[in-house]
Amino acid sequence: MNTVTENVFPPREPKPKWLRVKLPTGKNYTELRGLVDKYKLNTICASGSCPNMGECWGEGTATFMILGNICTRSCGFCGVKTGRPETVDWDEPEKVARSIKLMKIKHAVITSVDRDDLKDMGSIIWAETVKAIRRMNPNTTLETLIPDFQGNTRNLDRIIEVAPEVVSHNMETVKRLTREVRIQAKYEKSLEVLRYLKAQGIKRTKSGIMLGLGEKEEEVIQVLHDLRDANVDIVTIGQYLQPSKKHLPVKEYISPEQFEKYEKIGKELGFRHVESGALVRSSYHAEKHIH
């Protein structure tokens, strides 16, 4: 049994007022919510209780998770189950494409669990999902939020060949905390993945980090420098929230002013888009990042 599931951390601090969100409303949200419930569509927006769900759905954007809901990794920040994943569903690409068509999604974000149990690490299903979406939804733009595929270029090439408008891979945290937060991942390997994607012709690359895990300001700024050095175009910076008592605790709630400071620094470094705020998640304002 891994340490993430065994540890029980101290009681959580109450959330500050700037982390409170209004319940989602609006015609677009209501219609999409009805479709998701009726057809049991698998969006991480709903299953992950994302605070921005109403806003994103109102803009015609949604995020879908493929390759099941059990991950082979046990990252200390992540609420996705860890264990032995189920058999690959080879009909999944068509199912996701149909969901996008039913929901009339203008911009779709696709993400997945890590599948280190598979020889191709899930990259074939990834590519087939993009192809199916393109066939069934020719006007829908795409972002693929990919795992590191252990840095295997053959698997990365499968993503590159289907040419999503945006390819993202999250650093998640600063270099010093990577081993504690991401466990099986490596900071430099993630940077190598992002460099490779850009070098092989991906037009827009993107990455994201969470704050509140004990990082220092200078470490956050260093991540921003490292991402720019890797020619990353877009960065998202948000507040880490503890999914359960068994996950890493929140060390600090970052103030709105500090998020604004990081946004200013990111823009000065030359990122095309910087999304920085307590409620920002990887897919926040994703539809704007294709430009």
Curated annotation (Swiss-Prot):
Pfam families: Radical_SAM (PF04055)
Localization, UniProt: Mitochondrion
Pathway recorded for this protein: Protein modification; protein lipoylation via endogenous pathway; protein N(6)-(lipoyl)lysine from octanoyl-[acyl-carrier-protein]: step 2/2
Stored PROSITE patterns: RADICAL_SAM
Record GO terms (molecular function): 4 iron, 4 sulfur cluster binding; lipoate synthase activity; metal ion binding
Cofactor(s) in the UniProt record: [4Fe-4S] cluster
UniProt main location, coarse: mitochondrion
Positions of the Radical SAM core domain: 57-272
SMART domains attached to this UniProt entry: Elp3 (SM00729)
CDD domains documented for this protein: Radical_SAM (cd01335)
Reactions this protein catalyses: [[Fe-S] cluster scaffold protein carrying a second [4Fe-4S](2+) cluster] + N(6)-octanoyl-L-lysyl-[protein] + 2 oxidized [2Fe-2S]-[ferredoxin] + 2 S-adenosyl-L-methionine + 4 H(+) = [[Fe-S] cluster scaffold protein] + N(6)-[(R)-dihydrolipoyl]-L-lysyl-[protein] + 4 Fe(3+) + 2 hydrogen sulfide + 2 5'-deoxyadenosine + 2 L-methionine + 2 reduced [2Fe-2S]-[ferredoxin]
Key words of the record: 4Fe-4S, Iron, Iron-sulfur, Metal-binding, Mitochondrion, S-adenosyl-L-methionine, Transferase
One Gene Ontology CC term in the entry: mitochondrion
Cofactor info, note text: Binds 2 [4Fe-4S] clusters per subunit. One cluster is coordinated with 3 cysteines and an exchangeable S-adenosyl-L-methionine.
Residues noted as binding [4Fe-4S] cluster 2 in the record, renumbered to the chain: C71, C75, C78
Family according to the record: Belongs to the radical SAM superfamily. Lipoyl synthase family.
Extra remark beyond the main annotation: This protein may be expected to contain an N-terminal transit peptide but none has been predicted.
Protein name: Lipoyl synthase, mitochondrial
Organism in which the protein naturally occurs: Nematostella vectensis
Upper classification of the organism: Eukaryota, Metazoa, Cnidaria, Anthozoa, Hexacorallia
